[in-house]
């Protein structure tokens, strides 16, 4: 079962905009019994590898969070949301999955709109492995929908935007996360 933890990233030490504050407030409203964890430069080692170091030094915080979200959910389990994701209901029904992901369109899965997993989940590990060519910091950055979807395709995902169940988790159509 996925633990009742919500992870999010906020790197750069800047003040959160109104939208982020509103979205985080919605998590607290609909998930009062969840632990909410902000990952930032104080509790995540920016020097984990050359990729994380490069992203941070070049203020590519969105790309940094694409990678960090996978590591923290893999290590700790829980749900991840970008700070522009507003909840309109409690997500407890998703916790029974080993992992859950959502399509953003018929071809791509997007972990930023929300995903969750038990710690050490196979699919999340596969997503982390997709970053291996980038960890030296010499190959630039790439958006997470492409990398994350490629990882799930290797595990049997069909790119058609449909509801799909696997031994490692469930992928939901975009309607669940829009």
Protein language model features and the residues they cover:
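Small-residue hinge/turn detector
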Residues: 67-78
């Amino acid at each position: 079962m996925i633990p009742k933890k919500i992870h999010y990233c906020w790197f750069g030490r800047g003040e959160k905009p109104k939208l982020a504050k509103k979205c985080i407030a919605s998590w607290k409203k609909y998930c009062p019994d969840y632990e909410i964890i902000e990952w930032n430069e104080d509790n995540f080692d920016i020097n984990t590898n050359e990729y994380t170091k490069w992203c941070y030094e070049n203020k590519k915080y969105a790309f940094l969070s694409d990678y960090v979200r996978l590591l923290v959910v893999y290590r700790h389990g829980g749900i991840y949301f970008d700070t522009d994701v507003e909840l309109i209901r409690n997500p407890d029904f998703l916790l029974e999955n080993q992992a859950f992901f959502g399509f953003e369109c018929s071809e791509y899965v997007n972990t930023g709109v929300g995903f969750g997993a038990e710690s050490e989940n196979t699919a999340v590990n596969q997503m982390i492995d997709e970053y291996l060519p980038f960890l030296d910091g010499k190959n630039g950055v790439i958006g997470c929908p492409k990398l994350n979807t490629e990882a799930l395709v290797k595990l049997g995902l069909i790119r058609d935007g449909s509801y799909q169940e696997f031994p490692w988790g469930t992928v939901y159509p975009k309607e669940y996360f829009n």
